[in-house]
Design a protein with these regions (language model features):
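Alpha/beta-hydrolase active-site loop
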Residues: 397-418
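Short beta-strand/loop motif that positions the catalytic acidic residue
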Residues: 579-581
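Short alpha-helix in the alpha/beta-hydrolase fold that links the catalytic acid
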Residues: 589-599, 610
């Protein structure tokens, strides 16, 4: 799932320092230049031989002309000539920061040699863990499908540009001019001139935060050249004509993946911060990093499961998923949890929550300060939540129908036994909401009226423009997934987690690759990332039905989905609906949620929250963060609805609470788990949530 927004909110949490080995030298941080000075000087000397005859002044004029058009160089800043404070005769040229090369004695070389030997050994173990943990045929099948799809997709882009050489020549000229300008600016810096950068990193791009990326001309040249080339490549996708929407999204995705992977920040020789750390630690940082790499590949059963937080700091039922309650029902698909009341009176109408099964339910009960469940209980609601099973091969045939019958519909039966209430209000989140919408259409078709109001959190029912996840669900990829699931009976949770991570490669992959495996630094403790790392498996039948019926064929929106022989039509759903979308959601994009909200036959209250798929939903009022927007009925286009919407600061939770209690305002004395016809099985959060993938 997407955790990008809350990860940004976690900036103030410092990374826990790596445990130092007794062999690790104690050093002080100093500016880096000697490691790159010799390379830069050779490049500089060779470039001077081809520099314009008019020399430095001509070079400065070239920069000031701003050769590149804006479309070819986003965020370009022209260098300005500043008058010197004193004459050039009396002012020696400024030199780039340098330090003498480290003075290495025999002891240091011995430490380096030992660390390099250990590094080789850890690399061997990492390779062994990767090769030993995955079935070779299955791994090749999915990898081959991914490579084939990337090649085919980018081939369409290449075909457009190469079909007319003059068209390609124009874009090549833009690239060459931009790189030439950056190089000329670098020459000026080496000659002592203070010149501003031509290419500025995006706000929030932390890869180049170290001052040495700007202070050292060589690394500044690398940084600017990389950023310019990456943006140029992205512009090529935008300018390519004749691509359908899906192919364009995929082309941008693959281009972003490649650009992120080749960033100079990802390699020791081209990252000044990494280079310094490696020299100062004599390579021991790499040894620590490779040890973590071996552990993470082993944890992923042959696939890399990147550690994003210190999971040992969190314990279910202690400082996560700790709202008091009882498991009151268990079957092959779910455990049903009833939470203990904290008020003397409660609303008569119970609330059932159906979370997604691609992650565990406790995203809605992270801790005492970030718990939608705890907050809802405190407002006087009787809350039940489904904890989905983390399936093994024995659950391979549990499909969408089973999750509907043995999940939501069974939960309604159990709630009536526990509370005496025949009707309930139900909330669904993400794919849990898609299942809920499917269930509502089924209930409407079969005359079942036990749900009298419904809430959707970041839920799609129309998948015609379903966001970046569509990248993974074309027929070739699904066939490869089916081949793998035929052997295991499920989709491995690590694969799903890696797919979500690839949607934000800089923030959710390469940041941790650099920090964990190159710097050798353990990640900090962060509750949301701990939940995100606690991935679950998905039954083969469920995954195949959902991805094909929704993402590929869009059957629910078209009125063509059939469950148990019943054809479903969302327009038959007439009950009141509260529909929450979040503005920065890339998994369930707000325009897609808005479009789907038009398919229901009853009254829909559409609310747009700030932030993304997780942070926009889990936004407690006490945090006083973000905002939400409200407007009239769900009609017209999404952009027009947003343009006329009213913005309210803070959490949407109180707004929802007023809506949901207005549907059924009656109150009754508080009900404890076990008061009804059911005997509690165990304390919340239950057993299913503790099963690891």
């Amino acid at each position: 799932m997407d955790v990008d927004q809350d990860a940004k909110e976690n900036k103030k949490i410092k990374k826990s320092p790596a445990k130092k080995s007794p062999k690790q030298a104690s050093v002080t941080k100093k500016p880096l230049a000697s490691q790159s000075a010799s390379v830069a000087n050779v490049v500089y000397d060779s470039a001077l031989e081809t520099a314009p005859a008019s020399g430095k002044q001509q070079t400065k004029k070239t920069i000031q002309k701003k050769i590149l058009p804006k479309s070819a160089l986003p965020k370009i800043v022209a260098a300005k000539k500043e008058p010197p404070e004193t004459s050039e005769k009396n002012t020696p040229p400024k030199q780039s920061k340098e330090i003498p090369a480290p003075n290495l004695g025999s002891a240091e070389f011995s430490a380096i040699a030992e660390n390099m030997a250990e590094l080789v050994d850890q690399g061997r173990k990492a390779l062994g863990a990767a090769l030993g943990g995955v079935d070779g045929g299955e791994a090749r099948s999915e990898l081959a499908a991914s490579v084939a799809d990337a090649t085919k997709t980018l081939g369409f882009v290449a075909e457009y540009w190469l079909s007319k050489p003059e068209r390609a020549a124009v874009e090549q000229a833009h690239l060459y001019r931009g790189l030439a300008d950056i190089w000329q600016q670098t020459l000026l810096r080496y000659s002592g001139e203070e010149t501003p950068p031509l290419v500025i990193a995006d706000v929030g791009d932390k890869r180049f935060a170290s001052p040495e990326w700007q202070e050292n001309p060589f690394f500044d040249w690398l940084r600017q050249s990389y950023l310019f080339t990456s943006r140029w490549a992205g512009d090529l996708i935008d300018k390519t004509e004749g691509l359908d929407a899906q192919t364009r999204v995929k082309a941008a995705f693959y281009t972003r993946l490649i650009s992120s992977a080749v960033s100079p920040s990802n390699f020791v020789p081209t990252n000044p911060e990494l280079l310094r750390a490696t020299v100062e630690a004599k390579g021991e940082n790499l040894v620590r990093g490779f040890r973590m790499l071996v552990e993470d590949i082993s944890a992923g059963h042959g696939m890399l499961k990147i550690r994003q937080t210190d999971e040992d700091k969190f314990k279910l039922g202690v400082n996560m998923a700790n709202t008091p309650g009882k498991v009151v029902w268990r079957n092959d698909v779910m455990e049903l949890i009833q939470y203990a009341p904290t008020t003397s009176d409660v609303y008569a109408r119970p609330l059932l929550i159906t979370p997604p099964w691609i992650n565990k339910f406790y995203v809605l009960d992270l801790n005492s300060e970030k718990s939608f469940v705890r907050w809802a209980v405190a407002q006087g609601l009787t809350v039940f939540i489904i904890s989905w099973v983390n399936p093994d091969e024995s659950k391979a045939e549990k499909g969408f129908e089973a999750y509907m019958h043995e999940g939501i519909l069974t939960a309604l039966d159990v709630i009536e036994q526990a509370t005496g209430e025949r009707k309930a209000t139900v909330a669904g989140y993400c794919v849990g909401g898609t299942l809920l919408a499917t269930t509502l259409a089924y209930m409407a078709a079969t005359g079942d009226d036990r749900i009298d109001s419904v809430t959707f959190f970041a839920t799609q029912v129309d998948f015609s423009n379903a966001g970046e996840l569509q990248i993974f669900f074309d027929e070739e990829r699904l066939a490869a997934m089916d081949e793998g699931m035929a052997k295991t009976g499920y989709l491995d949770g690590v694969k799903m987690a890696n797919a979500f991570n690839m949607l934000r490669p800089n923030e959710l992959i390469w940041t941790y690759v650099v920090d964990n495996y190159m710097k050798g630094v353990e990640p900090a403790a962060f509750d949301l990332l701990a939940w995100n790392s606690d991935c679950t498996r998905i039954p083969r039948a469920n995954h195949s039905f959902y991805t094909r019926s929704c993402y590929v064929e869009n059957r629910l929106a078209r009125g063509e989905m059939v469950i148990d022989g019943v054809k479903l039509n969302l327009n038959n759903v007439k009950i009141p609906i509260y529909e929450l979308a979040t503005r920065e959601d890339h998994i369930a994009p707000a325009p897609s949620v808005f479009r789907g909200a038009k398919l229901y036959g009853g009254d829909v209250t559409f609310v747009l929250g700030g932030a993304g798929h997780i942070a926009g939903v889990i936004n407690p009022p006490s945090k006083d963060k973000y905002q939400y927007w409200t407007n009239g009925p769900v009609v017209g286009e999404y952009d027009k609805w947003v343009a006329g919407a009213k913005e309210t600061k803070g959490s949407w939770w109180p707004h929802w609470f007023q809506w949901v209690t207005a549907q059924a305002p009656q109150k009754v004395p508080a009900r404890q788990p076990g008061d009804g016809k059911l005997t509690p099985l165990c304390d919340a959060p239950g057993d299913y949530v503790r099963v690891k993938s």
